[in-house]
């Protein structure tokens, strides 16, 4: 008999991998994960164990009979009791009325209470409370608001404890959108999967192959509507795939605080190996903290070498299970549809072990996958429901937009009325187009949804989206002191691989006040827009060694407020990071020439010195600028302006093509033909 894996045995005997692993531990048999091999001896032990637990047919029949009998009895009891139910309720209500109202031990309130409200909560007459307030020197009417201190004073007089409830504003629903539900309300949901990888390694082909071979039963041959996400079914279990365009969308969502993906599939071509975008995808997935499955594609090619792919990926801490690691590698051929079932089974296996759950019995919350404006339908948004159930007609707030769900379309183009957890749907009915990554929440009341949506839109105008504080070396020390930073994320780019490794190794050794450096991505070549997007999503600082950012990277860094540091000497990088962490980073200044003036004539004045009659030939000369005197192309003096005049008046600046009078501090040897160059020192944005 050949060896069998844990998950294969579980599948064969119709039990979950998790239950089987628990059983093995009870039997004192160590297994590391669901891919562990079981030998013949262990398999025999398990067979005996499960055989012993299995009830006989007679037992099963007896149990079933008891259940049926108990159901019948309960129905009889219900019938008997039905006639007297109203009488019992009347008697109970009567008894309640005759009972005296007891004083509570504790009351709760939020904000303030009126005298009448406080009297109700304390089970007292309002006149009694007014009398007590009068005794305290407070003249109050029944509708007058009382502050927290007064409420506590009155309640304490009756020996009643007071608790103030802090109400979280529903406008900021992101703060409580991810609150954990009670365990008994949670039910299994499909896993949400994102496919990433290098260009031309077969991401799109894999998505198409999965979609075409595994559309839900009855939909084969139907036109699949592209809504940015879709579901497939295998063994009566669903999997949701996000068809996000590239890594940028993935990180943009993460930058907005939306964690939509449960599992990431990294596609690597067997004939091409690990490429720059593959590494990028790995770092994006690691930064998101989700399980990774490696799909080794193009196995049908003659040059396919899966061992090489495995070897290369071990450098990025993705060690295959066959080599003692815990990363699942699945060989596939997307174009021929080979290995697709195995890949989907691995996704279901991870789902089973991770136990992805949500509460379907609440108002829906989730994330926008994509959105657009359609001429005929208006605003169309693809939403991924992450918790709760979304229904047609639900009032909804999406980012800063709001509305009522007018219509819902599934990934196969069918109109649906409800969408549960992990279901992607396209909706209409919003007042404006939201952004990918915006969170949404359904509400019971349309008026409330409108009010919250308008408030959020107003707040967004006051504080522009994306202006959240990004980590920079200037404020690093302050953030460390305030306890905001426990780990510094860095992205390292250099001109050669040797420099990358040397710099990363040196940076990892830095440890100041328990704050450590974490390198989230390294690479060779110019700093790209993709690096900046990853830095923005992960709140990281980008360090370039002998490389520069390209035009798009510069523009994106300015928009996202990402700190880029460029260096030519490794120890300077280390010194700068350490200095920043210790709060000793000095600001860096850069000289900027703002203008030049030519000396046309000189005048010697007693007690004043030499006055130069000048003509501004370029830019401008300002009163607070530094100056240098240039004679025959050589700088002969550097200092400060003493006076700057137009005719007899002191002025702050003189523009190009105007004349002026200039005196220089502690320098009188000015001659006709000298050039006075004005400059200022500007702090460099690092």
Curated annotation (Swiss-Prot):
Annotated region described as Disordered, given as residue ranges = 54-105
Tell me which InterPro entries the record gives: EF-G-like_DII, IF2_II, IF2_N, P-loop_NTPase, Small_GTP-bd, T_Tr_GTP-bd_dom, TF_IF2_bacterial-like, TIF_IF2
Localization per Swiss-Prot or TrEMBL? Cytoplasm
Compositional bias of kind Basic residues: 69-81
- State a GO cellular component annotated for this protein: cytosol
Q: Which stretches does the entry tag as region G4?
A: 297-300
Location of region: G2: 222-226
**Where is GTP bound in this sequence?**
197-204, 243-247, 297-300
Q: Which GO terms describe its molecular function?
A: GTP binding; GTPase activity; translation initiation factor activity
Residues of the region (G1) are 197-204
The record, for Pfam families, names: EF-G_D2, GTP_EFTU, IF-2, IF2_N
Q: Which domain of life is it from?
A: Bacteria
tr-type G domain mapped to chain residues: 188-357
Sorted alphabetically, the keyword list is: Cytoplasm, GTP-binding, Initiation factor, Nucleotide-binding, Protein biosynthesis
**Chain intervals for the UniProt region annotation (G5):** 333-335
Presence of the UniProt keyword GTP-binding in the record: yes
- For region G3, the annotated ranges are 243-246
Q: What does this protein do?
A: One of the essential components for the initiation of protein synthesis. Protects formylmethionyl-tRNA from spontaneous hydrolysis and promotes its binding to the 30S ribosomal subunits. Also involved in the hydrolysis of GTP during the formation of the 70S ribosomal complex.
Which NCBIfam families does the record match to this protein?
IF-2, small_GTP
The family classification in the record reads:
Belongs to the TRAFAC class translation factor GTPase superfamily. Classic translation factor GTPase family. IF-2 subfamily.
HAMAP family per UniProt = IF_2_B (MF_00100_B)
- Stated name of the protein: Translation initiation factor IF-2
Q: Which organism is it from?
A: Bacillus anthracis
Q: Which gene encodes it?
A: infB
